[in-house]
Regions:
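Terminal presequence/propeptide segments associated with secretion/organelle targeting
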Residues: 2-5, 10, 17-707
Length: 707
């Protein structure tokens, strides 16, 4: 089942009702007293309002980076640190064969050289409040579709109201605790964001897929951008050459002091999605369907992309971002399933549900908001398994995979604004913008053929549209022959072709394929939606039952891409029966670089090998160890979306940027195991060292003024 349709929930405590200290993704405006007191006990040294509320609160320096990552403002002139992989798509879009910033890196020596990225934005959270009573009054007795429409309407109303005070603000209404709570969050978005600095990809993505989700790591996963603002108001503005660097309300102080084992560490960012209240039945479906399908289909997609990317530099640039994104979640799903099995997560969760059932029985709970029917929930998941499988294969195989099929979807769904006279529908037409520089025809054809063939081999016959009969009867089940014919006869990829609402368009074989696939999806969802709604109602009750059973404990909501704080400590963990070190050094990076002749993921430019071997680390070396420390571990609770999250010490100073989790914790989206789960961060001193010694970015270092 899609993450977006399931579970805005809370904590999963397996085998115990007690919450571990170093667990949780906490909203800041209503941070429980017990959590703040525990933070202080572990080494946090600032007043509570320095987290949220004061003008110079730490949270005011943290940003949502373009809707998929996190970041932090580090200077009075709007300079932003985030991960290299967060800036990856922007860097890739700015790169050309002649100016390959992805391969060679980039440093703007002046404001004038900073490169605008048209697709980036950053958001600052200005305020958050609980509006649950208001929402519950509006949605009482409504179904899921009606509730969604009401929430959208309320969001628009609140945004319209706030814009009468400040037109640069907007409000988002989000469900928390699986729909048991609703918060309204006020944001301010800045659209003019420019690339300032990036290391070469060989360093920003050092280790590649070989090291992804692994420890130890030596990746310099950072990139630097700047926010620009209206010169008169210091507020958001569309890109203009007249815009000036933004003067932020607050920025994070950058520390050169580093960290020691068991030091306090805190992340603040925008974690995307967790499902820690998910029932054992939901975890089983996640393992057997969503994750398994994702791995199986992406095995094929990744192999096809790599084949063409290895042949041609232009194709590499076209598909590199797609490849990296796809590979990341492919490996995540593999690791998550292994973790689910290795710790017996489904069994543990079933035992915990039995505990909840005993509590409900002993207390004779009659509240319909709490009295979950676990047998009904189990049956609902069984009944939803087939449509869930079809939906998973459909999404992985067809949505945003092939340029031709995606264009067919866009026309079929009316996603492209018609051109021509508004008073004469027969003269109106749809025309695609020329994006031929973004994709490779041969790759697209092979991908379409492979996805259609794989879909047919794994989905029941009842869910295969008519096109599969055509491929069988007219093309002898030869998917290559079919796609050769399809691409030769469809106008979907013909530059500047105009699609009118007429027989020619309806008879286009590409359009016909798109219509059949969309109709299939609608057919699947017609029967599936009612199951999803029923599942969500029972999961919602399960969440509330846990909260009420553990009334004496604070609970955090599942991640939903709103700002969250997580705290913990610096430290390693047991790997294969041995204690891992909690940081890596330049020496370990050099050793891996030496393997670059045989392993592409460890191959770097010679200057990088020279820099790290020279050991001219100066003020960036750790004062205790004397080493250049590169990456480090904490037990902060993070997930996707936390990439780029600032990592603060107990004094609220920036010591690193979170960029990954470890292999042994890949089930953390549904279960946080404090013994295994680790946040991997890039040491801010390694970031500054590369800016200094490789980039010679003196003006930026003066602006940041690390202490």
């Amino acid at each position: 089942m899609k993450k977006s349709t399931l579970l805005i929930a809370g904590l999963l405590a397996l085998g115990s009702t007690s919450m571990h200290a170093d667990e949780g993704m906490w909203t800041l405006y209503n941070l429980p007293d017990a959590v703040y007191e525990q933070m202080v006990a572990e080494g946090f040294q600032l007043p509570r309002n320095m987290l949220y509320g004061a003008p110079n609160a730490i949270s005011n320096s943290v940003i949502n980076f373009s809707g998929f990552c996190s970041g932090v403002v580090v200077s009075p002139n709007g300079l932003v640190f985030t991960n290299h992989h967060c800036g990856f798509s922007a860097i890739n879009a700015l790169s050309t064969v002649e100016h390959d910033y992805m391969k060679d890196g980039f440093y703007a020596k002046s404001y004038a050289e900073e490169l605008p990225s048209k697709d980036l934005f950053v958001s600052f959270m200005k305020k958050q409040e609980d509006i649950t009573p208001r929402v519950n009054k509006l949605i009482a007795g409504k179904n899921a579709e009606q509730t969604e429409a009401i929430i959208d309407s309320l969001t628009n109303h609140l945004t319209d109201s706030i814009k009468t005070i400040d037109k640069t603000l907007h409000i988002s209404v989000d469900a928390f605790y699986e729909g048991n709570k609703y918060y309204a969050t006020t944001y301010q978005d800045f659209q003019d964001v420019r690339l300032v600095f990036t290391v070469p990809k060989s360093m920003g993505k050092f280790g590649g897929e070989t090291d992804n989700w692994m420890w130890p790591r030596q990746t310099s996963d950072f990139s630097v951008f700047r926010i620009y603002a209206d010169p008169k108001t210091n507020g958001p503005a569309a890109y203009s050459k007249d815009n000036v660097p933004y003067k932020p309300e607050n920025w994070a102080p950058v520390s050169l002091e580093g960290y020691k084992d068991k030091d306090f560490a805190m992340t603040i960012g925008y974690p995307g999605s967790t499902n820690r209240y998910l029932s054992s039945f939901g975890i089983q479906q996640r393992r057997d369907i969503e994750n398994t399908v994702q791995v199986q289909v992406r095995d094929i997609k990744l192999a096809i992309m790599k084949k063409y990317m290895d042949k041609n530099e232009k194709t590499r640039l076209q598909y590199e971002n797609k490849y990296v994104t796809s590979a990341n979640y492919w490996k995540n799903s593999i690791g998550m399933n292994k973790c689910i099995d290795s710790i017996g997560l489904i069994r543990q969760k079933a035992e915990y549900e039995a505990k909840i059932q005993r509590w409900l029985d002993e207390k004779a709970v009659k509240d319909p908001a709490v009295n979950v029917d676990l047998k009904k929930l189990s049956n609902l998941y069984k009944e939803s398994a087939e449509p869930a499988l079809v939906q998973a294969y459909w999404n992985e195989s067809f949505w945003k995979v092939s340029e031709l099929i995606q264009r067919a979807f866009d026309i079929t769904r009316g996603a492209i604004e018609p051109q021509g006279p508004k008073d004469d529908e027969s003269a109106q037409y749809v025309q695609f913008k020329d994006n031929s520089s973004d994709w490779n025809l041969a790759l697209d054809k092979e991908m379409t053929a492979a996805m259609l063939k794989n879909y047919a081999e794994h989905v029941p016959a009842a869910y295969r549209p008519e096109v599969f009969n055509v491929i069988k009867t007219k093309f002898g089940n030869n998917y290559k022959k079919y796609t050769d014919w399809l691409y030769a006869n469809s106008k979907l990829l013909v530059k500047d072709h105009k699609f009118y609402n007429d027989e020619n368009t309806l008879n286009d074989p590409g359009i016909q394929l798109g219509v059949e696939l969309v109709m299939l999806y609608q057919q699947v969802m017609t029967n599936y939606v009612s199951k999803i709604e029923a599942i969500e109602q029972e999961e919602k009750k399960l969440c509330e039952a846990k909260v009420q059973m553990e009334m004496d404990m604070p609970h955090y909501s599942d991640a939903n891409f709103t700002m969250r704080m997580s705290y913990g400590q610096v430290g390693g963990y047991m790997i294969g029966g041995f204690d891992s070190n909690y940081y890596t050094t330049a020496e370990s990076l050099v050793e891996k670089m030496k393997l670059g002749k045989k392993l592409e993921d460890y191959k770097v430019e010679p200057i990088m090998m020279d820099l790290m071997s020279a050991k001219d680390f100066g003020r960036y070396a750790d004062k205790t160890t004397g080493k250049m420390q590169l990456c480090f571990l904490t037990n902060n609770d993070i997930t996707g979306g936390n990439s780029g999250s600032p990592m603060f010490d107990g004094k609220g100073r920036l010591i690193g940027l979170a960029f990954d989790g470890n292999w042994d914790s890949l089930s953390s989206d549904i279960n946080f195991d404090r013994k295994l789960a680790r946040c991997i961060g890039v040491d801010i001193r390694f970031v500054l060292y590369l800016m200094d010694k490789w980039g010679h970015a003196d003006r930026l270092l003066k602006e940041i003024n690390p202490q």
